[in-house]
Amino acid sequence: MNVLYDFRFNTVKSRTEYRAASSSGLYQPVTKFVLNSFRRRLDATAGIVTSAENIRTILESDFARKVHPIREYFNTLPLLNPAEHGHIGRLLNTVQVANPGKWEEYFTKWLIGVVANAMNDTGCQNHTCLVLTGDKQGQFKSWWLDNLCPTPLKNYLFTGKIDPQGKDILTLIAEYLFINIDDQLKELNKQNENALKNLITTPAVKYRRPYDVYIEEYPHLASFMASVNGNEFLTDPTGSRRFLPFEVLRIDKPTAAVSYTHLRA
């Protein structure tokens, strides 16, 4: 098997993944279909008769090296030359906001929190949700937020609506780098709003993964961001320091001048 494929155990998703040996392509999950294909290939080419369940048991052992793909990505980014600067500023210049005085300061703090959350298991390092608001639809708000996720990590980006009191959100917090809430914040009732505030800052989540026997605790990995059509979304008249709202006037699609690698490094 090692001659044909490279294997790793993804500690974020708690599953074994594979790719062709010596390939630089993305790893893919070992699904039931893949397991059956492995079994068929072993039987046909090597004369080894075994079960798909036996192969799965082997692959979910120290046969596959453990990897945290998100941390591996950040650890392989190049070290920046101190003389180089302004990568965040160039990205933020693609967005014209109504309150530009705080835009770079608070975005930078939030982005640092994203990386800190991903690199540390203890506690929640990012206590805020970046929110882009605006009266106009089709301003590319959600698109711009989605592009903050590196291409190699797109499997760790969730964009859509959430249930703050449901079980699925616990999986998203433990297994994703970004949760992009798409035009939902102004629809939340008071109960769901309070639940979301708690989720943003919770240090860990507890749930039982499919096919696991016990409920286990997992560190808070995800950082929250959101887009809203309109400028009013908080039902609490006193506001909330958990949300960092910026009213978008215009978004220009980033050009090649923006270095996303340097931005995240």
Predicted regions and their residues:
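P-loop NTPase catalytic core of nucleic-acid-dependent motor ATPases
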Residues: S61-A174, F178
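AAA+/SF3 P-loop NTPase mechanochemical coupling elements
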Residues: I169-A174, R209-S227
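A short beta-strand-to-loop transition that corresponds to the Sensor-1 phosphate-sensing loop
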Residues: D183, L221-N231, V248-L249
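A short helix-turn-beta junction within AAA+ P-loop NTPase domains corresponding to the substrate/partner-engaging
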Residues: T235-D252
